[in-house]
Amino acid sequence: MNHFLKYSFSFFCLLACSACNDDGIDILDIEIPEGYALSAGTSTIFLNSSVAYDTPADWITGAYDVRFTRGDRLYDDVRTSNNGHGGGLGPVYAGYSCGSCHRNAGRTKPSLWTEGGSGSYGFSSMLVYISRKNGAFFQDYGRVLHDQAIYGVQPEGKLSVEYTYETFSFPDGEAYTLCKPNYTISEWYAEEIKPEDLFCTVRIPLRHVGMGQMMALDPVEIEALAAKSNYPEYGISGRCNYITERGVRSLGLSGNKAQHADLTVELGFSSDMGVTNSRYPEEICEGQIQVNQGSMMGLSYDQLDVSTEEMENVDLYMQSLGVPARRNVNDPQVIKGCLLYTSPSP
């Protein structure tokens, strides 16, 4: 990972490279203007295709390339509800593979937009977080509402959304429209939760490309950058998020609002797909009626659904994805946007 650290600061700075729109350009062929850096140093790749996010960095060779391919396969393979290899889906879940929500290591269009809520084809490319208004969890439910389930098992609930559209104007008079989502959860498997008692957050999938570079950064460097990110005139104060996992206090690096110290691929398999592993060996619906319903449908809970080696391969796959270079950097409109982005506000 040391070759990542050399370029770590560039991940937090203005990133650019000279124009290159043709696939297959080698990093040594690129002239980097003074004061700029490639998006991910030696992990920068030059692809504009639909698989640009799902391509290994050029330094992935030999045994690492084999493991990358295996991890990629596990990431994309559809899990089934059988008890053999590739099984373990459910009893409740949100998606049936990592790739169902993170297509080509990017984002799948959420069923929130395509179907107005929970998906009707066995997966919902979104996560529905539920809690009490004070942040506590509800009895009979966890932090995520699992709105999908295998055949014969009852989902925890179903989400629907309606949008309210409002029109506003910029100072120069140009109009724009914002839509406000209004969420409703129905078909609760246990006691119905009243809307006035419920805090619901719906999150669309994250892109996974570039996370390897975040993992490679020196925590001291991140803390130093956060210390500089204070803008009292705007009411902004940058700070790191520290978390405690398994009794160890660490700097949060991944997940929504940096709630995890690593890529937590095991949590994704467990919470999103119901696939048990050595880090999360219990079913995500442990203690709920869905466990018994799953048993009646033939599920066995006597073994882990994926091995530690398989999880390590998925982790390596995500850590070593190449990061596409910025495109169209010499386009006049892009240059204007870059200047606006980096200029102090009036």
Name each region found by the language model:
Residues 46-47, 53-67, 77-311, 315:
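Extracytoplasmic redox metalloprotein regions
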Residues 88-92, 330-335, 339:
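A glycine-rich, coil/turn loop motif that links secondary-structure elements
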Residues 341-346:
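Conserved small/polar residues in nucleotide/adenosyl-binding loops
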Residues 1-42:
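Bacterial Sec-dependent N-terminal signal peptides
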Residues 68-78, 100, 334-340:
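Extended, hydrophobic/aromatic-rich amphipathic alpha-helical segments that build helical scaffolds
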Residues 315-330:
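His/Cys-centered metal/cofactor-coordination and adjacent catalytic loops
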